[in-house]
Amino acid sequence: MAAPAQPQQKKTLLMTEGSIWKSILLFSVPLILGNLLQQLYNTADSIIVGNFLGSNALAAVGSSGSPIYLLIGFSQGVAVGAGVVVSQYLGAKDKKETHIAVHTSLAIAVILGLILTVGGIAVSRSLLVWMNTPEEVLGDAVTYMKLYFGGVLFSVVYNMAAGILNAAGNSRRSVLYLACASITNIILDLVLIAGLKMGVAGAAIATDISQLVSCVLSLRFLMKVDADYKVELSAIRPDQRMTSRIIRIGLPTGIQNMVISFSNVLVQSSVNSYGAAAMAGFAAYMKIDGFNILPVTSFSMAATTFVGQNYGAGNLKRVKNGMWVTLGMSVLYTLCTGTLLLAFQNPIMHLFTSDETVVAFGCSAMHYFCPFYFLLATLHGMAGAVRGTGRSVPPMVVLLISLCLFRVVWIQFVLPFFAGIEGVFILYPVSWALGAVLMALYAWKGSWMTYEHS
């Protein structure tokens, strides 16, 4: 029975011993590179759309993002819950429970993916009309959304598979598969949009195929790996007890994602009221925004995995120290990138379009966002650490108050006092500051680090 132990160690990064900062860095760097790579191909997608199809098409694809995330947010929350459960069982070295958790997670992903496919296609037009999408943008936006949801199953299953890999500390695989998906997406964008002139439909189809590639590659690895989290297709079924635990941990994050996405839909509706140029400028900047947001979420995931493994092993001192190390790395990253983006704002925005009105809207957003990303890093870093103990309700409450309720109140009662779109932009850093303060007040209490297996 001792023989399989060596391959297991090679395929699983256990962060329950050794240098804390090295463990977190070894896990985080591949994850950050993968997310940056993913954002790079998303940005390339928008650059190709903006340059070959024009600002209206760029606005259509960009404005579809908020309603898409509104619908898929719950599945992403469940994937977080599954990752927490798997990481805790791996930390506790419980092979049987790890096996059950992995296969239940994938079964849940398939079910959610099928539901989202049908539901997303059905409500696409109604949702975009409700968001006050301008008529000149609506047709392309509906086309993009419907085609995107045609392949959303691949995205949901990949996210769950990546969550399992990350829970095992094997984030390098996520980078590899994202690289393959990124290259596929960019090539297909050029072929379908620039070559075959398929318009925004080509952009959506390219995204679907790239997600299929990452899904197949990740599942193939999980089926071949010699580790406790190896996948057997015949064993993929929902275990009632494990489903209950995954949903219990993932439900708050899922609800949080959906409600926050709903607030972003309201924000997007406000942007839409300023016209197609504002929509295009905001859409272009939000692609740049991802180069800050995704690494922040990567560090948050690192905190969740590190805390999950050490909490499962009962190493509470490492839990606390790991949170602070991860938080410091995340804040430092955002300070550096925010400064660089501000320094090169004009040439960056001109990559997307030559329309000076669109560029002006994008640069305006950059002025309000970039200096304050460290607040978002603080919020998500602490939330990720707390979530790693299985206590996902407190982060949910904080994020719902700051990133949803506060934004809704702002849009309804504060935004009318602003003459221009700046009132929408300033909403973001103010809500980040509120969330960071509330999360810090909870995290510093320390009660979430009490050791208890649920």
Which sequence ranges carry the predicted segments?
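Small-residue hotspots at the loop-to-helix junctions and early N-terminal turns
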Residues: 55-66, 145, 204, 276-291, ...
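Transmembrane helical elements of multi-pass membrane transporters/channels
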Residues: 26-45, 147, 181, 210-214, ...
